[in-house]
Design a protein with these regions (language model features):
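Membrane-proximal intracellular helices of multi-pass ion channels
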Residues: 1-436
Length: 436
């Protein structure tokens, strides 16, 4: 039985949080004295009103949450955050249709990064900031806000964590899920602030630094410039953003162990991190060498363009520092393949995730060994732990469904007249809708 009252109460709290972010954007609109002030104020009022109604509906709720309730809350959070989040775009008139405004906002909250805008730089500062903020909020999952506030209601967080956590295995930095969520948000905020400081030091203005740091840490890819990172024409900025895209692709539990505990041993014993480092290293080396011999770039520029695009695409961020579709076919084909990999589970990235690729690789290896030794017992171990048959089946099912969705999307787009290569690229990109 779904606990509708508790769901309503939690959603009410989330709506108030979103209203707070909208008010923050209205302050920015006032500071720049631009035309989107009223749009943000109306949006905040509507969202807060919905929060009040939901809170009243959840009055005297029974203090329990089932796994089913967790999935309902996660689903409703994504949908309603996008519905209320689209209001500033629509009410300001900069995105005049509801469908386009909803698409832009949902793309932000899911950190997909797809956009219907063809002149991003025409948006006022408030809307540009809100656009970046949608990705930052969605980066670790809206529900992590809920996990942080659940103790206020006297409700456990485990079911929500199970519904939102990425990857086939779930790591905790603390026995209490709420504490885990708060530590993860601390790291998330710390990465964002550090990147802002470094980008400002490199000559990017403060506003652009904030917006790009929000979307880098979220691995979302929204930029304040139509030409993305290429518009800044700065090697320093490219290297800094590459570094933080890479860090955002690491499991946040490992970042906690690294930055807050100084536990380097466990960090470098992690199987998934080995795969992440290995794939980024291999793809970067191959792309660099190929660019040196097939492009006008020098050695340093070839390396810089290669590592930026490899990290950007593997972490499903989507920032662009060069038009890789103009590179030789083997490279842009490789870039399309890299999109599928994803980085680490427990990070802000989409894609299949390296942990699933590692598990399937070892399962395949064991199957070949079984051909030679039919009676051998060959467990699959990840981080020195045996992976259960249930987890292996779940990984196989996920990869199958993921590839099936891409294939179907690819075919549908081609039916509507989209070209072969473009249809594939779009299908893969849109399938990064927070693929858990």
């Amino acid at each position: 039985m779904i606990n509708a009252k508790m769901i309503a109460r939690i959603m009410g709290a989330l709506f108030f949080i979103e209203a707070g972010f909208l008010i923050l954007c209205s302050f920015l609109a006032v500071y720049y004295n631009e035309s989107d002030i009223s749009a943000f104020l109306y949006s905040a009022a509507i969202t807060a009103g919905a929060g009040s109604i939901a809170a009243l509906a959840g009055k005297n709720a029974e203090k329990r949450i089932s796994r089913r309730d967790g999935y309902v809350i996660v689903t409703l959070a994504w949908v309603f955050f996008s519905l209320f989040g689209m209001l500033p775009f629509y009410l300001s008139g900069y995105i005049p249709t509801i469908t386009d405004a909803f698409f832009e906002t949902m793309s932000g909250f899911t950190t997909t990064g797809a956009s219907i805008l063809d002149n991003i730089e025409s948006l006022p500062h408030g809307l540009l900031f809100w656009r970046s903020m949608t990705q930052w909020i969605g980066g670790l999952g809206i529900v992590f806000f809920t996990i942080a506030v659940l103790p206020i209601f006297g409700v456990g967080s485990v079911q929500l964590f199970a519904a939102e956590a990425t990857g086939p295995t779930h790591d905790k930095v603390h026995p209490r899920i709420g504490v885990t969520a708060k530590w993860i948000w601390t790291i998330y905020l710390g990465l964002t602030i550090t990147e802002i400081i470094l980008l400002v030091a490199g000559g990017m203005n403060f506003f652009d630094s904030v917006c790009h740091s929000l979307t880098t840490t979220a691995t979302g890819g929204y930029s304040t410039k139509q030409n993305s990172i290429a518009a800044f024409n700065s090697p320093y900025i490219e290297y800094i953003i590459t570094l933080f895209m890479f860090l955002a692709g690491i499991n946040f539990t490992l970042l906690y162990l690294l930055f807050l505990k100084g536990n380097f041993k466990r960090l470098f014993q992690n199987t998934e991190l080995h795969w992440y480092l290995g794939t980024v290293g291999f793809f970067t080396l191959f792309t660099t060498v190929t660019l040196i011999f097939t492009s006008p770039f020098g050695i340093e520029e070839s390396f810089r363009k290669a590592i930026f695009q490899v990290v950007s695409l593997q972490t499903t961020t989507g920032f662009i520092s060069a038009d890789y579709m103009t590179w030789v076919p083997v490279l842009w084909t490789l870039m399309c393949i890299i999109m599928l990999f994803g980085a680490c589970a427990g990070s802000t990235t989409g894609g299949i995730k390296c942990i699933r690729i590692a598990i399937m690789s070892r399962v395949s290896k064991n199957e070949f060994k079984h051909i030679i030794h039919p009676n051998a017992i060959l467990p699959v171990r990840i981080n020195r732990q045996v992976i259960s048959s249930t987890t292996k089946s779940a990984v196989l099912a996920f990869i199958f469904l993921y590839m099936a969705i891409i294939f179907i999307g690819w075919l549908v787009l081609m039916l509507f007249g989209v070209g072969f290569e473009e249809a594939y690229s779009v299908a893969v990109s849109y399938t990064h809708l927070r693929a858990h």
